[in-house]
Each structure stands twice: as C-alpha cells, then as structure tokens.
C-alpha cells in the first residue's frame, strides 16, 4: 500500500529528527485531498499539528483536537513572515519552491529549531516541464509518485535531498466504475488546472 510505505518513511523521519511538532502547509481545500490520508494518520495518533493555509483547507470535514492549531494567513506579507519564523520538526506540503523569496524557509535561531521540509506531488506531470527553476532543490525529503519522476528529480535537487519513490497517494482511492453508455457524438476536454486552462485549448 502506498499509504503504508509513506507513513513508514515519515515515522523514520520523525524518529531521526526527534519530531514533536508537525507543520502542514496546505494552500487551500483543493490541495488538502492530496495529503488527506497523511494528515488523518497524524491527527488520529494525536501528534502536535499546526496547519498553515490561505483558507480553511478542511471544507466540511470536522477536525477538533487540542493538538491541532490552524493558522489562516491574511495576505502575502503574513505568509512570508509566518514561514520565516516557524519552529517545528517536520514541514509537509504539496507546494513546490520552498526556500525562495515567495515561499521562504524558517530563519529562526538556533537552526536546530527549524523544520525539515517534505514535499508531496499534487500532480503527475514532469518536474522538468511544469515547474520553475529550483522548485525542488531546497526540500529535505521528496516523495516521488513514479520511477520516471524520480529519475528526473535526481538532476533537480541538492545532494542533501532524499527522494523516496512511493507512488501517488490518490491511487489509493481508485474505484472500479461501471460505465456502459457510449457517447459517439461528444468530445471529452480535460484541461489542466488554472483559470485559463479551457481558453488556451479553445484558442
């Protein structure tokens, strides 16, 4: 199971770094589903969790625990200030480009109080094609969804980054569907995410 493999590696990272506080950076509700199973695991096991987000990432889900704190960022300035002053052991996110001016790492002293940074892919696109330069260079741990992406990542990270090929978490949710109706007179358009996804295809 993909989930089992990932939690095993994260538990190792927790022991290695003596982690007593886990931080999740989740941009919004649409990003939460990519690491929901990971979050649920730590939530149910009563880890000390801080979630940093641009909006409530849980939607209608009910998470109520004294060990969970939610930090909703007011604006870009608040985001940068918060990230620069983080204290914790592990920082888990699906957002690339950590360590850049728009997504900075913690700068607190002593350095031992700064978290290790873990990245989960929220898509299966090539890291060579869809990401800006240095999107992966500053992560400590990266969980790759495939062997091909792992091969590409090896040229995009620092020599300190550890890459684990674990698979794509959403594949744990695949269900067999029974679709028997054919639509010979229709075309399926599947644009990528973003406001201009459809308009770019139409033009």
Which sequence ranges carry the predicted segments?
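A short, charged/proline- and glycine-enriched loop
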Residues: 14-22, 113-115, 181-186
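Short, charged/polar "capping" segments at the starts of alpha-helices
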Residues: 31-34, 56-63, 100-103, 150-153, ...
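Conserved catalytic-core segment of nucleotide-activated headgroup transferases in glycan assembly
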Residues: 31-46, 169-203
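A structural signal for isolated positions on well-ordered beta-strands in alpha/beta enzyme cores
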Residues: 23, 48-51, 118, 141, ...
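Glycosyltransferases and closely related glycan-assembly transferases
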Residues: 43-44, 83-87, 101-116
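Structural motif
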Residues: 25-29, 52-56, 94-97, 121-123, ...
């Amino acid at each position: 199971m993909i989930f089992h493999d990932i939690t095993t590696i994260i538990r190792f990272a927790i022991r290695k770094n003596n982690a007593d506080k886990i931080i999740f950076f989740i941009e919004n509700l649409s990003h939460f589903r990519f690491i929901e199973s990971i979050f649920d695991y730590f939530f149910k096991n009563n880890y000390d969790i801080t979630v940093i987000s641009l909006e409530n990432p849980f939607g209608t889900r009910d998470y109520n625990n004294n060990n969970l704190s939610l930090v909703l960022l007011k604006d870009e300035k608040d985001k940068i200030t918060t990230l620069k002053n983080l204290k914790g052991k592990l920082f888990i996110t699906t957002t690339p480009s950590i360590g850049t001016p728009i997504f900075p790492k913690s700068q607190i002293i002593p350095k031992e109080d700064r978290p290790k940074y873990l990245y989960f892919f929220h898509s299966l696109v090539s890291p060579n094609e869809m990401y800006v330069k240095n999107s992966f260079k500053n992560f400590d741990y990266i969980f790759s969804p495939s062997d091909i992406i792992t091969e590409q990542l090896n040229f995009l990270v620092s020599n300190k980054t550890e890459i684990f090929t674990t698979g794509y978490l959403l594949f744990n949710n695949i269900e067999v569907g029974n679709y028997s109706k054919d639509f010979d007179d229709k075309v399926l358009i599947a644009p990528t995410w973003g406001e201009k996804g459809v308009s770019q295809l139409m033009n």
